[in-house]
C-alpha cells in the first residue's frame, strides 16, 4: 500500500497584497486622545464663560438702572428765594444730563432684553449666532454709554470747579445735593461701561474658542 506524501509549499505574499491588509486593532495616534479631550473641554469652558457673562450682564443692568434713576430724579430747590426768582436746579435744565438719562435708559433696556440670549448661551454653549449678536450689540451699548458718561462727567466737573476763563461759577457750594446725585449717577454709568467692556471681551474669547 503506497503512502502519498503531501507537500506543503509556502507562497510569500506580494507587496501589493500586504498593502491591502490592515490589522483590525491598533493603537490610535498620540494626537487623537488630546483632540478628543479638547473637544470635551470646549463646551465646559464656554458654559463657564456664559454663566460669568450672565452675572456681569445683570450687574451692568443694575449699574445702568441706578445711574438712570439717580440722574432722572435729581432736583434741588434752595430754601431762599426773591420776589422774582426761585433758585432751583434740575437735571433737565442741562441738555447733556437729559441726553444722559435717555442714553442710559436705552442701555438699561438693552441689557435687560439681552439676558434671555445670555441664558441661551448657557444652554447651548457651542452656538455661535447668539454670542455674535451679543458682541455686536454690546459694542454699540458701550459706545452709547461711554458718550453719555463722558459728556456728563465734563458738566459735573464744571459744576464742581467752574471755569474762570469763561466766567462760569461753580454751583456745588449752593446746590450740594444736586452735585452729589449727579456725580453718583456718572460714577454708576462708568461702572456700567467697565462691565460692558468685560462683556465684549468675554464674548470675543468665547467666539475665539470655536
From Swiss-Prot:
> Which superkingdom, per the lineage?
Eukaryota
**Membrane topology listed for this record:** Multi-pass membrane protein
Predominantly, its location class is membrane
Where is region (Disordered) located? 1-25
Q: Which residues lie on this side of the membrane: Extracellular?
A: 70-98, 160-183
**Transmembrane residue ranges:** 49-69, 99-119, 139-159, 184-204
Q: Does the keyword Ubl conjugation apply?
A: no
Summarize the protein's role: Regulates membrane-cell wall junctions and localized cell wall deposition. Required for establishment of the Casparian strip membrane domain (CSD) and the subsequent formation of Casparian strips, a cell wall modification of the root endodermis that determines an apoplastic barrier between the intraorganismal apoplasm and the extraorganismal apoplasm and prevents lateral diffusion.
Q: How does it assemble?
A: Homodimer and heterodimers.
Name this protein carries in UniProt: Casparian strip membrane protein 1
State the organism of origin. Erythranthe guttata (Yellow monkey flower)
